[in-house]
Structure formats: structure tokens, C-alpha cells
């Protein structure tokens, strides 16, 4: 397996010019994310069927050729389980690969488990056992070892031929349009960014709080998310989620009270005064400015019963279509549908279970069930 390590702008330009001539390329990324909010890009792997390149992002300055390749609609980009890679591209280049085909999604449409691993598919299609010993390596350390480079190169070297076969199988099974729709949905989900003022809704057990406490949590969660993004620090390294909830619940007025709520020394040292000030702001809010209480979906009358009925309808659709129940509907998607039906959460888009390719299979039976609730 021959590869070239790309460390210059001119080298990247040559790789992208060459890749543009191909209808399909395989892409992968290696990144590190331990304490940071954003993934830190350590390596990009690109294989166009002729040339396998390991692109070192640390010395490269001129990314325009790569950004143009990502958005070149004449070149299909294959990724495997690409959700995190999409986040990396979005963060580093403000661009998603278009069009993008995720081979894990193709595998699911050809009868394999929903989260079929890359190594499993490579063993099946290429009859090669991949060495995964470098999976947890530090991709920001330099120089990269030969072992790291071979590991990284294998990810795209086997991905491209395997992807071509999966595309063919998906086509033969009649699911090409649905698989494309699912890949698009993955890109859509990745493009959605959480508005800081709505971050409080994502905090576990936020529904247990009264409006005044919720108003406090809204201020705290917005501040924490903005801090995390500005300082590129994982949210729980700013203030842990359970501690944020405790502050909102008890609305302390002093640093001593923060200590008794169980906040860590560094949390109090760095952010104690800010937290107490935000609590004071929340205490002053007009009643009319407080958020509505958050309904808890699973406490809704009939939740368990309707959930069970929906699951049963999905099993029937799975048997009829030959697609797994996991692919057809996740718990998140069922809850999204019920939140929409009961108007507990307002979104711009129709729920995934009654739109796109899933809607073709599920909308009619699910709407029949929902009429009873």
C-alpha cells in the first residue's frame, strides 16, 4: 500500500487537481478531542483510486483547493460512519463534502446491522484483517510514525473498492434513492447548531425545574455554551452539567453556597462570581420573561402505550421492506414524532419518521396510530 505524505500547499494543490479527475474518492480524518469543544484535526486521508495521500493539516496554510474539492458536485465522496468527519470538515473548512455517501448507511440498506464497523466490512469484502491498535493514538503528535501512517492509509485504501460494491448492492436492492436521502439527512443534522439561548432545554432533568429556576438555567447554559465555543473547551470542562443544574435549582447567592452544592474548586475559582451574578440576574427577571415549564415527554398520558404501538408498526414495516427496525426508527426519532404530535417541541422540519424515504414506508400507519392520541 503506497501512500504520500502531503505537508505543503503545492502538494495539496497537486493532490486536489488529480482527485478532481475522478468520479469518486474515499475520505477519512483522524482527530483528537479530549478537552476541546471542537475536534482538532490531525490528518486527512484521501484516495482517488490511483493516488493515496495523507494530508498533514498542521503545516498547510492554503486550503482553497481542498475546499473546492469538497464542494465539487462532480466528485462523490465516500466516508464510513462519517458523522464526526462531517463535523471536522464543517469546523475546519465551513464546508461539507457534497455529494457524500456514507458506506455505513449503504451497509444498513443491504441488510447489515445499523452500526456495522469498518473492520467488519473490510474483512467481509476484502478478506483483510485490519490492525486497529493505532485507533487511540495521538494524531497531533509529530512526527507521525510509519505504523500510524499505514493504519490511516488503510482506512481509505479499502474504503473505495468496498464502497463501489456497496453502491452496486444498494442499487440491486432498490434502495439507492433512500440511501442518498439518508446521507443528506446526516449532513443536515450535522449542519444544525444549537442556539445558546436554547441550550437549557438540552440539560438533563431541566423539566424538573420551576419557571424561575428554569430562567436561571437558561442564563447559565447560554453562558456556558458561549464560553465553551469561545475558549474551545468541552462544555463539562467549563462547569459540569449536574453542577449547573444544582446552581439553577438552589439559586445560591454566595461562593460558600456554591461549595456546599458540590462545585469543584476550579469551577468556583474561575467562574464562581459569574455564576452568582447570573443567579442574581435570574432572580430579578419579570415573571413574563421566564421560560415556560418544559414538559417531560415520558410523563405524557398514553406515552408508553403509543410508543409500544409505534414499535409494533415498525416491526411490520421492517418485515415488509426487508430493512432492519433500527434503520427504520430509533428511539430519538419516535420521541421526535411524539414531541411534534403533542406540540411539546416546535421544529422547522417535519419529523423524520413521516418525511423522506421513511415517510413513504411509515407515514400512513403512524398517522393512523396517532389519531388515537
Swiss-Prot record:
Gene3D superfamilies xref list: HRDC domain (1.10.150.80), Ribonuclease H-like superfamily/Ribonuclease H (3.30.420.10)
An example Gene Ontology molecular-function term: ribonuclease D activity
Organism domain of life: Bacteria
EC number: 3.1.13.5
Cofactor requirements of the protein: a divalent metal cation
Any single GO CC term annotated in Swiss-Prot or TrEMBL for this entry: cytoplasm
Presence of the UniProt keyword Transcription in the record: no
Keyword Hydrolase: yes
Subcellular location: Cytoplasm
Domain 3'-5' exonuclease: 3-171
SUPFAM superfamilies in alphabetical order: HRDC-like, Ribonuclease H-like
HRDC domain residues: 210-289
UniProt-listed GO biological process terms: tRNA 3'-end processing
Main location per the UniProt record: cytoplasm
Catalytic activity: Exonucleolytic cleavage that removes extra residues from the 3'-terminus of tRNA to produce 5'-mononucleotides
CDD domains registered for this protein in UniProt: RNaseD_exo
Keywords from the named record: Cytoplasm, Exonuclease, Hydrolase, Nuclease, tRNA processing
Annotated function: Exonuclease involved in the 3' processing of various precursor tRNAs. Initiates hydrolysis at the 3'-terminus of an RNA molecule and releases 5'-mononucleotides.
UniProt similarity note: Belongs to the RNase D family.
Protein name, per record: Ribonuclease D
Species of provenance: Serratia proteamaculans (strain 568)
Lineage, broadest ranks: Bacteria, Pseudomonadati, Pseudomonadota, Gammaproteobacteria, Enterobacterales
